């Protein structure tokens, strides 16, 4: 037995191949499981619909009789409070209706003539009158802030804001109750007070526990200002929800996402106040938690050695067309002797505008398919085709669809099968159960795959064209909004992008020249932002990468990311795994 084990060739590549076979079998099992689940869900839904139709036909009369009672007791659109199963009571509904319907249109002083006063009310003394005037001025100022926040809100957003406001207040009340409890578990004041306050309107609800006293707790201006801080961030959150079409399953998830958004928003704001190399901005990742980022960015698949030997043609730099490899020094000086300082394939008209992979983990498909599009345009007089990422997601058996993959395996699929036109096989941002490449009328095929080492990147870009690279992404990378990224990365490669060029710029001109690519005109913008020159104003070197997070991310869908002069420092992993298609 020992002799048999020695004979077996358990090399690293063999183990990786064995691991891949196991992963492929799991993928097949998952597809079978999905089919079974869809079948079960279909039968279940049919049964539910049948039951509902039967129940509706039997209860038409009872629903008609009870309709008037339901309308008087609740407000449509306001969901139940999470956890207690109770609808908002009538007083709370009227309060929220007043705040989000009447208040924004009002501009009244709470001390005005429309405030009802007792007939026998005592005349205020001079000191009380001054305090009231000061409070009224503060209230008017806060009222203007409120109007600015909710001016552009739709009715749905105001309704959602009401829900969130209630949850925030409820949370603060629970915290206050815990602070007031003595060691024996008794409340010191024996009551719970909910304050919903805006200028010109104070609402107080007192819920007595043991004490039947109707004493009310006055609302301070500081409490009102704290409320407006929450309104400000909530307003930004709802703008984010509308822009990126976010919808959450319930108020609990919405509150959790709001918490993530506020934390990320403050991080972005703090970063932009200090960093001079790159800026962050709110984007589709702004409601992500650390756990969400870890789930979205998964480690790319490994490549066994035997597949590299079978398919990869190592890049061989040509020296003056003589077909000899360039001999490079440790500094890379000879390698870069005759290359330009700046190269941008967007300006050469062969780079498609960035697409959007959505919530599907298919970055590897977009990087590889985009690479094929560039190479085809380079060799066919700048004819840019739109090829199908969805075909590669569904049909490449060596990849795992939305669960991850690698550009290298996409190139292998293109060698063996070709890649379909995008119009024939449109992107769905999800795994189809079956490969549907029978739809394809025309395809682009490859002959082989090229491989590049980290110290050959600059020359390969000049001689070959754009190449596919893998990077280690963090939340810093995800929030990129412009400039030259030099933030934190991971050693684990978890995202694929397309490298389309490189450049250099003085530090003081990062946001002034060559800053953001204008996809409408096909030229670089100038003069967007500028910072004062520094005494030690050095040169900043960068790569230009095309991402797959839509043209609204980063600099119109692209990123400038830091590098050293030779381009071999593998910052963020650029240079560790580099491949390109050979037509």
Swiss-Prot record:
PROSITE patterns: THIOL_PROTEASE_ASN, THIOL_PROTEASE_CYS, THIOL_PROTEASE_HIS. Glycans are attached at residues 70, 195, 272, 381, 486, 494. Residues 106-119 have a biased composition (Basic and acidic residues). Keywords: Disulfide bond, Glycoprotein, Hydrolase, Membrane, Protease, Signal-anchor, Thiol protease, Transmembrane, Transmembrane helix, Zymogen. The keyword Transmembrane helix applies. It is a single-pass type II membrane protein. GO terms for cellular component: membrane. Residues 62-82 have a biased composition (Polar residues). Pfam families: Inhibitor_I29 (PF08246), Peptidase_C1 (PF00112). Residues 56-583 are lumenal. Cysteine protease. This is Vivapain-1. It comes from Plasmodium vivax (strain Salvador I). The gene is VX1.
């Amino acid at each position: 037995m020992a002799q048999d084990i020695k004979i077996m060739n358990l090399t690293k590549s063999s183990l990786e191949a064995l691991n891949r076979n196991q992963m492929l079998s799991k993928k097949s099992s998952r597809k079978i499981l999905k089919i079974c689940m869809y079948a079960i869900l279909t039968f279940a839904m049919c049964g539910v619909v049948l039951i509902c139709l039967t129940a509706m036909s039997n209860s038409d009369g009872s629903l008609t009789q009870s309709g008037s009672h339901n309308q008087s007791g609740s407000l449509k659109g306001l969901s139940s409070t999470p956890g207690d199963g109770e609808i908002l009571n009538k007083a709370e509904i009227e309060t929220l209706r007043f705040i989000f319907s009447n208040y924004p249109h009002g501009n009244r002083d709470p001390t005005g003539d429309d405030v009802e006063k007792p007939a026998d009310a005592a005349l205020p003394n001079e000191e009380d009158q001054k305090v009231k005037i000061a409070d009224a001025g503060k209230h008017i100022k806060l009222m203007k802030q409120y109007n600015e926040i909710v001016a552009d809100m739709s009715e749905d957003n105001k309704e959602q804001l009401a829900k969130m406001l209630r949850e925030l207040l409820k949370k603060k009340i629970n915290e206050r109750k815990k602070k007031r409890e003595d060691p024996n578990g008794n409340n010191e004041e024996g009551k719970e007070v909910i304050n919903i306050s805006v200028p010109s309107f104070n609402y107080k609800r007192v819920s007595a526990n043991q004490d039947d006293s109707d004493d009310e707790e006055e609302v301070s201006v500081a409490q009102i200002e704290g409320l407006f801080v929450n309104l400000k961030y909530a307003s930004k959150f709802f703008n984010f929800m509308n822009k990126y079409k976010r919808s959450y399953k319930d108020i609990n998830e919405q509150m959790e996402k709001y918490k993530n958004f506020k934390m990320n928003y403050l991080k972005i704001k703090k970063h932009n106040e200090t960093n001079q190399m790159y800026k962050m901005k709110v984007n589709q990742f702004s409601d992500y938690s650390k756990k969400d980022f870890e789930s979205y960015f998964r480690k790319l698949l490994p490549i066994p050695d035997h597949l590299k030997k079978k398919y990869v043609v190592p890049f061989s730099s040509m020296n003056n067309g003589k077909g000899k490899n360039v001999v490079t020094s440790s500094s890379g000086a000879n390698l870069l002797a005759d290359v330009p300082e700046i190269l941008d394939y967007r300006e050469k008209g062969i780079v498609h505008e960035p697409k959007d992979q959505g919530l599907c983990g298919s970055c590897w498909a977009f990087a590889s398919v985009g690479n094929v599009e560039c190479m085809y345009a380079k060799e066919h007089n700048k004819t840019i085709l739109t090829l199908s990422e969805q075909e590669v997601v569904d049909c490449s058996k060596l990849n795992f669809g939305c669960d991850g993959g690698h550009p290298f395996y996409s190139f292998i699929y293109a060698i063996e099968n070709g890649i379909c036109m995008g119009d024939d096989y449109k992107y769905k941002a999800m795994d189809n159960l079956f490969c549907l490449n029978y739809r394809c009328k025309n395809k682009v095929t490859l002959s082989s795959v090229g491989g590049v080492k980290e110290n050959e990147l600059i020359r390969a870009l000049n001689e070959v064209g754009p190449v596919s690279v893998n990077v280690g992404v963090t939340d810093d990378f995800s929030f990129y909004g412009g400039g030259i990224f030099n933030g934190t990365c991971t050693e684990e490669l978890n995202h694929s992008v397309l490298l389309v060029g490189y450049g250099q710029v003085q530090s003081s001109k990062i946001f002034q020249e060559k800053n953001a690519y204008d996809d409408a005109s096909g030229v670089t913008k100038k003069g967007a932002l500028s910072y004062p020159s520094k005494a030690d104003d050095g040169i900043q070197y960068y790569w230009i990468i095309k991402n797959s997070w839509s043209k609204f991310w980063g600099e119109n869908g692209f990123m400038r990311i830091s590098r050293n002069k030779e381009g071999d420092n593998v910052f963020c992993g650029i240079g560790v795994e580099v491949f390109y298609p050979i037509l």
